[in-house]
Amino acid sequence: MAQTLLNDTFLRALLREPTDYTPIWLMRQAGRYLPEYNATRARAGSFLGLAKQPDYATEVTLQPLERFPLDAAILFSDILTIPDAMGLGLDFAAGEGPKFAHPVRTEADVAKLAVPDIGATLGYVTDAVREIRRALTDGEGRQRVPLIGFSGSPWTLACYMVEGGGSDDFRTVKSMAYARPDLMHRILDVNAQAVAAYLNAQIEAGAQAVMIFDTWGGALADGGYQRFSLDYVRRVLAQLKREHDGARVPAIAFTKGGGLWLEELAATGVDAVGLDWTVNLGRARERVAGRVALQGNLDPTILFAPPEAIRAEARAVLDSYGNHPGHVFNLGHGISQFTPPEHVAELVDEVHRHSRAIRSGAGS
């Protein structure tokens, strides 16, 4: 049975086509701010139990869509699945974030790195993509909203692989980048091949758009960013399947703290660039001059404000972009676990309401 996408607003916005309103989805929209997510995670036993079991991953992917009229679903997974599949021993200690049992710090460590067999080691992710697509589709083949697949960027994965977990200053990985750039580039080359293979597997399984999260690209200096992050994002994009089942598969790239390099990121071959909250959206639109769509960029902490303040800030973001195609509303980073769900409802409603008013010429 042929599938029909009931709401393709998100995909059309990524391709800079006119839309009746501005689509919205949120980074970490399936997460700890939702009581139902916490209940499912408790049943799964752990975060990795949640991410590695397709039925649980499907359940939590759909939870925010049951609460809010969001315009896209995003696969529930983690950016560190690739280094875990490389055998680095990923674990999430309570209250400590991700840790790797076998960080990559020596020549011998780097020599052991290889692109994982995606089907053999990450089949649970592609199984989840297929299961989520089925769950989004009714008995008559009508799919509610598109599904986004994703990966961490080669540099961001390397940050965790070399540090062995999160870091306040990334001194271990940055020291390697400048003291032993040969080792750093070998890690990044393997990572770029792995990210491209991983995203292509998600596309073949049914992801209708993909996003590269370069969470720590902004930790690099100008010059270092181009060598160690941007160049490898470009390599990933060059290897991506951009069409599947006769449809364009848009790609989004997001560098947190990367506003300085917006024009360079827009020139990598992406369809859309994600922006954090430090960037003026209207000026960003002028800077990219219609070459790419833009995604963002409300400060996530605004969701702790009273509802009318949330609505006012949402309007400010929309007004900044103006009545132009190519905007996907999102936060400038992931939603906080402490966010009241009812505040998310206010945001989604205002984005849809006010963007329709802008399109109609009614303003506020």
Swiss-Prot record:
InterPro entries (UniProt xref): UROD/MetE-like_sf, Uroporphyrinogen_deCO2ase_HemE, Uroporphyrinogen_deCOase
Binding annotation for substrate: 28-32, 78, 160, 215, 333
Catalysed reaction, written as an equation: uroporphyrinogen III + 4 H(+) = coproporphyrinogen III + 4 CO2
UniProt function note: Catalyzes the decarboxylation of four acetate groups of uroporphyrinogen-III to yield coproporphyrinogen-III.
GO cellular component labels: cytosol
Pathways involved: Porphyrin-containing compound metabolism; protoporphyrin-IX biosynthesis; coproporphyrinogen-III from 5-aminolevulinate: step 4/4
GO MF annotation terms: uroporphyrinogen decarboxylase activity
The protein's name: Uroporphyrinogen decarboxylase
Lineage, highest ranks first: Bacteria, Pseudomonadati, Pseudomonadota, Betaproteobacteria, Burkholderiales
Top enzyme class: lyase
The species this protein was found in: Burkholderia mallei (strain SAVP1)
